[in-house]
């Protein structure tokens, strides 16, 4: 029973080197691909047959073994195994790398997983990996301590040596000084002696000279002097004077003076000599002290330098820590300081070494957990990020070192093929070039390492190998992308996966299929609704194998080969056989773009001549097809099951209602509408008007005889009643003999013919039938015939004969569809016939210009002139002038349109086309017969110059030029809009694709209030909005209190009518928004399936339907941002598609409204040209004190007091009363016998309103507002709204806002589709405090999973986690889905896969995309039935294995325990549980198992 794709979950993880080697069939050692002479793969090369398998089926490389009989033999000569060549699509090889290489996804992804794990910044990590920096990978702590001590000892020694040197120098200096001073003293004594001797000699000389002179004078005493007599230059006696005793006395005096002067000079010289010696001594002493100081300083600086140096080097040694990044210089310096203490390395090898040696995940997780709980801010954030990665590795069983590759897998050669082109050249996959680079560099590196090449060369080669592997895995992620010939970027393995051309979107989600073709479509007016015309040539090609088999069966050919020849020669019998084969066979028709599920429908093929496919005109609306050259594709469902499914679910006649709105999508249009309109018109005064007929047959006979006109009003007596309103008089007559009602009716032959084509219950419609009327007929027909009360058993038996016995509801649905389809076909035939008979056509003369036009234009011109005059006089501003003129011309255009309308001939073809809504509208007509009006310029601003002409008159050159703006803008908008709408649809599909109806009832009590008051806002009737919902609470008659319907009753048409009659204005209904189903949605919350009009079935893919319903009309939405009045102002509102994207992406809107943050009173303030809006919340607290009789207040009424102030005291001295004291601060109020203090607490929130912002209606001074209310006009920011008003308010807001956009464009979508998407946007919660759960702060968790986990924790007495609701945009929500396959196939493929691989994510294949990707049936529709059947089979097997007596089974008695557990796990996954958790199956599990089957428990169950 276990098949290759019979699994229920798929896991992705990192591959270990052992895994890679186990996948490999051999090592690729050579870069060669194929030999260009023999065109055979080279041995050990990238296409080697020995490794990857033979290139030809059952044939080895050398040709020794050929044919299938040698299957499995390995050739002894060439080593190739004889097998099928398709193994070359699955066999892998490997390259053993000479040096480890990092995987770029884990290095360059954000956040860098390797960086987080090692706590290294991505920049530093990159520098290590690409050999720019070293990383310390090993530290010998013992050696480090020794090195530290040695260094300290060395510097201690150095310091001592320097101090000793300094001391010896000091001693030397002192000795020198003492010597110098001693020398100076002896020199001084010598100098004194010399001076004494000198002066003694001089004294003796003077004395001798005086003595000589005295003796001369004594001799000549008494004589007159012959000449002047001098003594040492002084005149003693002049010439002629007599020498006397006085002269001798004078000589003695002079001698004494001379000797005294000499003595003084001697003393002076002695002093000078002494001073000189003193100064010299001082100088010497000063110099010595200076030298001493210098020595001291030098010593100190030397010591300081040593201390500094020691400190630096000690710091360097201390900084030797694991994971430290070093530059080349730092590495060299450290190696000198601390040789042998550490080992530093670079490249991926170093990182791998580091991880293997140092990372203990359990210990690291514990440390990080402590950090998360004990720190705040940035540190906590970082610890959380790191913890997330560590936990991922711990839980998944992946090893961190596997992020570094030592063995590189080589993908199978047929996935990177090489093909020969015409000119003998070869085209090859880029991957081969990238692999070749890796192999070349790897081989070169091996050779260099063998040769012991210099480190720098080896290192460079290692870096180049790293870059080659990076380019192979993800080219262009780091540095410049590797490009091949012609500068084109080579496509790497990552590029093979991502983007529209990647594996996911190109080959897994969408494939090209066989048994298909395409051709142009033409209209098939004679086809039935469920038929299509298939060209014979096409059918023969499509059904070739079937035809060949039938030819053999019928004996036209003996074997398939000859049958093939017959078909190729197109013998006549082929066509008969083809007719037989194709009878009752369904084909699928598809028109691209497939915007919704009705773009692919099944039809019975009808063989036709020609080459074009014929399509029924009524299904064009569903396909959005027309016949102006559209093409459609045909697909053949091959298996019986596929045929059955196509017939039951996809046949066009069973897809009559639009899944988006529930209205008929099979609506007659254009010619059919025109024919029916023509047929049901009344033309008073036409031939035969007013005649009376006794019966319908009589009237028809008169028409056949040409007595009355088809549109003439006549009176006819008939049986039955008028259906709905009648636009002509009706007189009821007495019933006929069977009791059937009869009436006399004014009608026309046309209406009789028309009603004859209607089914009995839908007659008699006596009014003008336009497009809307035809739609009503189809809708009424479907409603009538799908209602079981209107059907007989015979009716149901008809369907049973076709489809076997089914639930009565299903039978009614099929019967209703059959009847509606036949009704639609009858209307189609009738419409076409009478459109032809009526001969309505259109000519230029039918476009009549109303005579009033000139007057309207003249009036407008006059008013414009007046406005211009006022502007010139300065009475109005430029802005006002522009607005006035635009308004005048808009009014003129409206009046012209009205005039065209009135002037139209109601029986003219143009009026008939417009009024019947067959084609065109009054605005187009107005442009043809009235005036074109105002145009807008390329920016969307309205040009004030109107186009006064119409197309009938023709435009002037200027008018034509002005009108081209609008035309071109329209085309550009359409092109852009289509792409945008497509992308929006894709995002919506992705966010909702796993929303499938999985269970009957989730049991929630919550729901959604729908209010009549919202009608105006969302432009839809209250009745329409509640129809098809289920009640979440009983519906009560507001007047009598009578219960009209109970909880979980469907609100059908009858109940809706009752609500309207009783004017009930609010209903509490079940809604997808409130659904609590673990996976998907429950039937009750979803309600009615709009495509069938019945309660939704289990297995319906409601998420996809919702996304298609919103995305499909996306192209109709306008792209541009509207400028109201044409001028940019505060009420610039984004509309159309950009607004829808804004809503679903939960972005901050343009022109965001300011919301009130608290409940309170509005105060509008203006400060320095700044407008501020203040919201003040006040709360009053009153503290009353009773005043006893003899107490008097000591404060005045209205006074402000503080806490503790005296309020009143006794006025009588004899009574010693305590004073009354204020218990709170506030304002005093004195009343009769009491005194109160009123305290006012104010909370104020103030916002600055932009100049352009307009206040929201009702916002003025003193207005009361609630939190979340608009203070200014504009769109609210949904994130703000979520914070202020909570989840429900934001849900309602998003649904209503999206509806506003669609309805303003006239697009109808049911609310529930938008609700399904909004539910997905609010699915996640962000963890704030993890409590005792294993969540991390900031983690995004599914809300149902969060509630379940908390309940579990509380039941065990633990502390639950806290979280806040998150509103995610659809892109973000798609990427946070539980399925990694769905997320990876959506966007950011590499990021999603990186994350999934590290966490070892398991995809339980619950959504549609993931099942399509791996090629399983989707779990929707018949796929869910298949899963249930499979589950039942497994239960059967378990029942056989499990003993019915006890749940506990002894290990030894259960040899098949593992197989049994695997079965049980698969069962759980099938019925919607996890692989590991039996609790999550919404109760279906027990229902499936029943009473008598006992399921043996898991190990973990036993522990629990």
UniProtKB/Swiss-Prot annotation:
Class of the enzyme per the UniProt entry, highest EC level: transferase
Entry keywords, A to Z: DNA-directed RNA polymerase, Magnesium, Metal-binding, Nucleotidyltransferase, Transcription, Transferase, Zinc
Gene Ontology biological-process entries: DNA-templated transcription
Domain of life according to the entry: Bacteria
Annotated binding of Zn(2+) 1, by residue: 60, 62, 75, 78
Requisite cofactors: Mg(2+); Zn(2+)
Keyword Zinc-finger part of the UniProt annotation: no
Catalytic function, reaction form: RNA(n) + a ribonucleoside 5'-triphosphate = RNA(n+1) + diphosphate
Basic and acidic residues composition-biased segments: 279-294
Gene Ontology molecular-function annotations: DNA binding; DNA-directed RNA polymerase activity; magnesium ion binding; zinc ion binding
Entries under InterPro entries matching the protein: DNA-dir_RpoC_beta_prime (IPR045867), DNA-dir_RpoC_beta_prime_bact (IPR012754), RNA_pol_asu (IPR000722), RNA_pol_N (IPR006592), RNA_pol_Rpb1_1 (IPR007080), RNA_pol_Rpb1_3 (IPR007066), RNA_pol_Rpb1_3_sf (IPR042102), RNA_pol_Rpb1_4 (IPR007083)
SUPFAM superfamilies: beta and beta-prime subunits of DNA dependent RNA-polymerase
Binding site for Zn(2+) 2: 1002, 1075, 1082, 1085
Cofactor: binding comment: Binds 1 Mg(2+) ion per subunit.
Annotated positions binding Mg(2+): 626, 628, 630
GO CC terms of this entry: DNA-directed RNA polymerase complex
EC number(s) reported in the record: 2.7.7.6
Disordered: region residues: 265-294, 1468-1504
Record PANTHER family: DNA-DIRECTED RNA POLYMERASE (PTHR19376), DNA-DIRECTED RNA POLYMERASE SUBUNIT BETA (PTHR19376:SF54)
Subunit description: The RNAP catalytic core consists of 2 alpha, 1 beta, 1 beta' and 1 omega subunit. When a sigma factor is associated with the core the holoenzyme is formed, which can initiate transcription.
Family: Belongs to the RNA polymerase beta' chain family.
Known role: DNA-dependent RNA polymerase catalyzes the transcription of DNA into RNA using the four ribonucleoside triphosphates as substrates.
Protein's recorded name: DNA-directed RNA polymerase subunit beta'
Lineage: Bacteria, Bacillati, Chloroflexota, Chloroflexia, Chloroflexales
């Amino acid at each position: 029973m276990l098949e290759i794709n019979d699994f229920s979950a798929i896991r992705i993880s990192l591959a270990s080197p052992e895994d890679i080697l186990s996948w490999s069939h051999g090592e690729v050692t050579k870069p060669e691909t194929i030999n260009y002479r023999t065109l055979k793969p080279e041995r050990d090369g990238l296409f080697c047959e020995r490794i990857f398998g033979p290139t030809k089926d059952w044939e080895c490389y050398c040709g020794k073994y050929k044919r299938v009989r040698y299957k499995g033999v390995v050739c002894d000569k060439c080593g190739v195994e004889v097998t099928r060549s398709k193994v070359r699509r699955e066999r892998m090889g490997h390259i053993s790398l000479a040096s480890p290489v990092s995987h770029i996804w884990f290095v360059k992804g954000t956040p860098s997983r390797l960086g987080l794990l090692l706590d290294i910044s991505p920049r530093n990590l990159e520098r290590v990996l690409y050999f720019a920096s070293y990383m310390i990978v090993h530290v010998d702590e013992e050696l480090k301590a020794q090195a530290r001590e040695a260094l300290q000892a060395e510097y201690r020694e150095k310091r001592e040596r320097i101090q000793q040197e300094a001391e010896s120098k000091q001693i030397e200096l002192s000795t020198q000084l003492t010597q110098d001073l001693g020398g100076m003293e002896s020199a001084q004594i010598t100098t004194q002696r010399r001076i004494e001797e000198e002066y003694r000699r001089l004294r003796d000389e003077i004395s001798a000279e005086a003595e000589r002179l005295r003796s001369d004078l004594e001799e000549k005493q008494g004589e007159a002097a012959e000449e002047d007599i001098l003594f040492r230059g002084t005149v003693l006696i002049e010439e002629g004077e007599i020498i006397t005793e006085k002269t001798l006395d004078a000589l003695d005096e002079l001698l004494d003076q001379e000797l005294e002067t000499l003595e003084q000079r001697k003393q002076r010289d002695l002093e000078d000599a002494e001073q000189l010696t003193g100064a010299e001594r001082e100088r010497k002493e000063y110099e010595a002290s200076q030298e001493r100081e210098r020595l001291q300083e030098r010593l100190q600086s030397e010591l300081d330098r040593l201390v500094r140096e020691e400190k630096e080097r000690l710091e360097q040694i201390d900084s030797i820590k694991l994971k430290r990044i070093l530059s080349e210089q730092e590495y060299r310096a450290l190696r000198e300081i601390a040789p042998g203490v550490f080992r530093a390395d670079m490249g991926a090898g170093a990182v791998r070494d580091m991880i293997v040696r140092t990372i203990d995940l359990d210990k690291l997780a514990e440390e990080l957990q402590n950090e998360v709980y004990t720190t705040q801010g940035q540190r906590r954030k970082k610890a959380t990020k790191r913890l997330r990665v560590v936990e991922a590795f711990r839980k998944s069983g992946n090893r961190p070192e596997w992020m570094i590759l030592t063995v590189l897998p080589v993908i199978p050669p047929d996935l990177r093929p090489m093909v020969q082109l015409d000119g003998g050249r070869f085209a090859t996959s880029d991957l081969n070039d990238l692999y070749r680079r890796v192999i070349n560099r790897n081989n070169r590196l091996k050779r260099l390492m063998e040769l012991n090449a210099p480190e720098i060369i080896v290192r460079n080669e290692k870096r180049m190998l790293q870059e080659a592997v990076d380019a192979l895995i993800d080219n262009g992620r780091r540095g410049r992308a590797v490009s091949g010939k012609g500068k084109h970027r080579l496509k790497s393995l990552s590029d093979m996966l991502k983007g529209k051309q990647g594996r996911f979107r190109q080959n897994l989600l969408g494939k090209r299929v066989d048994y298909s073709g395409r051709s142009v479509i033409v209209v098939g007016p004679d086809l039935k609704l469920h038929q299509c015309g298939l060209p014979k040539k096409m059918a023969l090609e499509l059904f070739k194998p079937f035809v060949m088999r039938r030819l053999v069966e019928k004996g036209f050919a003996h074997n398939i080969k000859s049958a093939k020849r017959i078909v190729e020669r197109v013998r006549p019998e082929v066509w008969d056989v083809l007719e037989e084969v194709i009878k009752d066979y369904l084909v699928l028709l598809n028109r691209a773009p497939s915007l919704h599920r009705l773009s692919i429908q099944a039809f019975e093929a009808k063989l036709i001549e020609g080459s074009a496919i014929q399509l029924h005109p009524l299904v064009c609306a569903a396909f959005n097809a027309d016949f102006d050259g559209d093409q459609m594709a045909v697909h053949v469902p091959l298996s019986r099951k596929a045929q059955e499914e196509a017939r039951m679910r996809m046949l066009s006649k069973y897809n009559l209602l639009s899944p988006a709105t529930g209205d008929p999508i099979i609506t007659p249009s254009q010619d059919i509408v025109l024919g029916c309109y023509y047929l049901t018109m009344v033309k008073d005064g036409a031939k035969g008007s007013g005649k009376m007929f006794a019966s319908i047959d009589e009237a028809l006979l008169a028409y056949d005889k040409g007595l009355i006109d088809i549109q003439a009003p006549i009176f006819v007596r008939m049986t039955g009643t008028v259906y709905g309103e009648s636009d002509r008089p009706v007189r009821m007559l007495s019933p006929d003999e069977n009791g059937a009602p009869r009436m006399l009716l004014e009608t026309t032959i046309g209406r009789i013919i028309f009603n004859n084509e209607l089914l009995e219950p839908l007659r008699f419609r006596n009014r003008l039938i336009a497009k809307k009327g035809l739609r009503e007929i189809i809708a009424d027909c479907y409603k009538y015939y799908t209602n079981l009360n209107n059907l007989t058993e015979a009716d149901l038996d008809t369907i049973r004969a076709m489809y076997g016995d089914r639930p009565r509801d299903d039978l009614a649905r099929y019967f209703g569809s059959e009847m509606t389809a036949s009704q639609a076909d009858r209307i189609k035939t009738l419409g076409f016939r009478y459109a032809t008979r009526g001969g309505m056509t259109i000519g230029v003369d039918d476009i009549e210009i109303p005579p009033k036009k000139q007057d309207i234009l003249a009036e407008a011109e006059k008013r414009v002139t007046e406005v211009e005059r006022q502007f010139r006089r300065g009475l109005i501003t430029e802005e006002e002038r522009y607005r006035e003129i635009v308004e005048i011309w808009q009014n003129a255009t409206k009046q012209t349109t009205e005039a065209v309308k009135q002037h139209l001939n109601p029986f003219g073809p143009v009026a008939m086309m417009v009024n019947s809504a067959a084609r065109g509208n009054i605005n187009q007509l107005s442009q043809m017969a009235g005036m074109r009006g105002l145009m807008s310029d390329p920016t969307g601003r309205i040009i004030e110059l109107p186009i006064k002409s119409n197309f009938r008159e023709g435009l002037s050159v200027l008018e034509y030029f002005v009108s081209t703006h609008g035309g071109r803008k329209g085309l550009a908008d359409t092109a852009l809009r289509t792409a945008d709408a497509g992308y929006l649809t894709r995002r919506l599909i992705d966010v909702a694709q796993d929303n499938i109806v999985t269970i009957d009832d989730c049991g929630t009590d919550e729901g959604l209030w729908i209010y009549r008051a919202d009608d105006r806002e969302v432009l839809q009737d209250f009745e329409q909005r509640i129809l098809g919902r289920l009640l979440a609470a009983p519906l009560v008659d507001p007047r009598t209190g009578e219960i009209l319907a109970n909880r979980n009753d469907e609100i059908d048409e009858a109940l809706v009518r009752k609500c309207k009659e009783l004017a009930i204005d609010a209903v509490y209904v079940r809604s997808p928004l409130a659904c609590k189903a673990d996976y998907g949605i429950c039937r009750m919350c979803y309600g009615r399936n709009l495509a069938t009009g019945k309660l939704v079935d289990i297995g319906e893919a409601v998420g996809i339907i919702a996304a298609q319903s919103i995305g499909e009309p996306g192209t109709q939405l306008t792209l541009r941002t509207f400028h109201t009045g044409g001028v940019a102002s505060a009420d610039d509102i984004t509309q159309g598609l950009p607004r829808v994207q804004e809503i679903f992406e939960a972005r901050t809107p343009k022109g965001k409204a300011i919301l009130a943050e608290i409940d309170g009173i509005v105060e509008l303030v203006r400060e320095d040209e700044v407008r501020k809006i203040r919201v003040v919340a006040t709360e009053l607290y009153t503290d009353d004190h009773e005043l006893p009789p003899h107490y008097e207040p000591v404060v005045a009424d209205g006074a402000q007091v503080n806490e503790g102030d005296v309020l009143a005291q006794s006025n009588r001295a004899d009574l010693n009363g305590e004073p009354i004291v204020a218990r709170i601060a506030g304002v005093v109020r004195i009343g009769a016998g009491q005194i109160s203090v009123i305290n006012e607490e104010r909370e104020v929130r103030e916002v600055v309103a932009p100049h352009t912002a307009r206040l929201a209606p009702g916002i003025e001074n003193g207005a009361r507002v609630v939190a979340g209310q608009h203070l200014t006009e504009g769109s609210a920011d949904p994130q703000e709204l979520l914070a202020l008003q909570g989840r429900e308010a934001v849900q309602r807001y998003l649904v209503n806002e999206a509806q506003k956009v669609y309805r303003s464009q006239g697009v109808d979508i049911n609310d529930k589709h938008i609700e399904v998407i909004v539910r997905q946007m609010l699915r996640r919660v962000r963890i704030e405090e993890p409590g005792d759960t294993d969540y991390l702060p900031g983690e995004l968790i599914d809300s149902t999973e969060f509630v379940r986990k908390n309940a579990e924790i509380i039941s065990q007495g633990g502390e639950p986690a806290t979280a806040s609701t998150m509103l995610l945009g659809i892109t973000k929500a798609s990427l946070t889905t539980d399925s990694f396959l769905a997320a990876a196939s959506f966007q950011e493929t590499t990021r999603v896969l990186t994350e999934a691989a590290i966490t070892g994510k398991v995809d339980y294949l619950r959504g549609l995309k993931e099942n399509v990707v791996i090629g399983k049936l989707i779990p929707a529709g018949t796929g869910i039935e298949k899963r249930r059947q499979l589950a039942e089979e497994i239960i059967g097997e378990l029942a056989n294995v499990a003993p019915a007596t006890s749940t506990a089974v002894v290990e030894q008695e259960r040899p098949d325990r593992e197989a049994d557990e695997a079965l049980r796990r698969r069962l759980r996954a099938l019925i919607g549980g996890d692989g590991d958790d039996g609790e999550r199956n919404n109760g279906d599990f027990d229902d499936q198992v029943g009473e008598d089957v006992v399921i043996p428990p898991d190990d973990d169950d036993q522990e629990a």
